[in-house]
């Protein structure tokens, strides 16, 4: 296996790639996790649109879940079902990542997180609702939904069940 590249090297690469702010270059190097290709993706902005769409879908799900807006959650599930299967699975992976990051913020160890910008702002506010009692069941729901999507389950049914299950878990810490 090829070892990961050092943060200093990636930071220098980010600066060569056009990043002028030292803090932003350091942050991009950290987010790349030692992967030069990931740094190039971050620098080029490729995948930003889908990542933003996933983030907006996640925020919407969590806000509706917290407020117990069940009819709107069904509408959310129909919206999520319109995505392609790969986009649905990518959303679920991203949702798991954001929940884990929120849990780390809740646990008081933000320095090991990989959030920035509006993801960091949202997850900082959302962190109190992701605790030791609900993080594992939430991640289990995500894994179950992802497996069902991979097995060609009806996405409307899968996401409706997923959204309603998440709603029950977010309110009960």
Where are these regions (language model features)?
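Charged, glycine-rich active-site and insertion segments that engage polyanionic ligands
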Residues: 1-94, 98-173
């Amino acid at each position: 296996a090829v070892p990961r590249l050092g943060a200093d090297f990636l930071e220098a690469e980010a600066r060569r790639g056009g990043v002028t702010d030292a803090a932003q270059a350091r942050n991009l190097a950290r987010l790349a996790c030692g992967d030069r290709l990931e740094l190039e993706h971050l620098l080029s902005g490729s995948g930003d649109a889908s990542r933003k769409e996933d983030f907006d879908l996640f925020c919407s799900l969590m806000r509706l879940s917290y407020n117990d807006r069940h009819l709107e959650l069904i509408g959310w599930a129909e919206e999520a079902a319109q995505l392609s299967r790969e986009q649905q699975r990518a959303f679920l992976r991203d949702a798991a990542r954001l929940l884990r990051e929120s849990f780390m913020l809740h646990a008081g160890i933000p320095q090991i997180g990989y959030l920035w910008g509006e993801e960091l702002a949202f997850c900082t506010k959302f962190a109190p609702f992701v605790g030791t009692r609900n993080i594992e069941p939430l991640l289990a729901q995500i894994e179950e939904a992802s497996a069902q999507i991979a097995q060609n389950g009806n996405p409307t049914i899968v996401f409706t069940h997923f959204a309603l299950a998440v709603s029950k878990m977010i309110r009960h810490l």
